[in-house]
Amino acid sequence: MRLHVVDTHRAIPEKEHPAQRCVGTSKTVRVENHEETSKSGSSLDRNPELQSFQQNYGEDPLADRATDLYRREFVMGFVEKWDELIDWDARAESEGQFFIDVLRAHGKASVLDAATGTGFHSVRLMEAGFDVISVDGSAAMLAKAFENGRKRGLILKTVQSDWRELNRSIHGKYDAIICLGNSFTHLHDEQDRRKALAEFYAALRHDGILILDQRNYDEMLDHGFSSKHRYYYCGDRVTAAPEYLDDGLARFKYTFPDACEYTLNMFPLRKNYVRRLIREAGFELVRTYGDFQETYHESEAEFFIHVAEKSVTSNLRLLDRRGPASRRTKV
């Protein structure tokens, strides 16, 4: 597998955004491009992933459960609409300072955002003063993230990388790695999950922390799906719900106000399974929160957030040096 560094400084400049019109269904979505590229060629010409506007699952979408599938799922038409699902303002209000507080309580400064998406957490952490490297496997997502950062006066440092070979793409060690937005669920094979966690572990300093989240698939598998759009996916005009669910696949359909529909094939990870994988990767302590709360009801939480410490002893020493106030922080 070859890794690519994306030049998002030129990925999709505003003047080169194609006019798009959804003309597909939930099985196959096509977006027509009505703007010709310049004679010199835009970056859409240079990067094949940024030219893709059609989701393609093959003859049987339910059988397509490969880890690399997300690159064909996050096509430009879907990525351009993704922030309608997120709703940055509502999401910022719902999660508050949770991630910022956790990182500060542990004395962390450098953060690798392993699942940048459209840049929500990279931007928030940069605005809070953290040194952030923004990583994603999708060139389209990184291009949108860079654009979102630029609109807010920030220049994101972006790298396109596969988690399974992360350390071939990045340099140095980091205080913290965040893998948010239910992104770990895109790994359909257990060996891929273990490899990704091993890469995260290796990229952290000796006292580093990993923050990884997931949907409450336990409740979904055992009792069915329900969502109040309180956290993460806060756009109240977008419908997100599984159209197929079994122990090995959660196929979600996303319906937007203009009737455009896209889908994602994900692996429904159970909470304790993820906790076990994290510990087996070498992390000494894993704390799990439900919807940003230390105390929660398993059946009511929409999302779980795992905070894993690489070295408990080192972090306890740090908290002791920072005084009693830091020890009272919920981390």
Model-identified regions with their sequence ranges:
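Conserved class I S-adenosyl-L-methionine
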Residues: 47-106, 108-115
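Class I SAM-dependent methyltransferase SAM/SAH-binding core
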Residues: 120-166
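A short acidic, Gly/Pro-enriched loop at the edge of an enzyme's catalytic core
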Residues: 168-176
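A short SAM/SAH-binding and catalytic strip from SAM-dependent methyltransferases
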Residues: 175-191
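A short glycine-rich, Lys/Arg-flanked "PGG" loop and its adjoining helix->strand segment in the class I
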Residues: 194-206
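SAM-dependent methyltransferase
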Residues: 209-277
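C-terminal lobe and adjacent flexible extensions of AdoMet/dcAdoMet transferase-like proteins
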Residues: 273-331
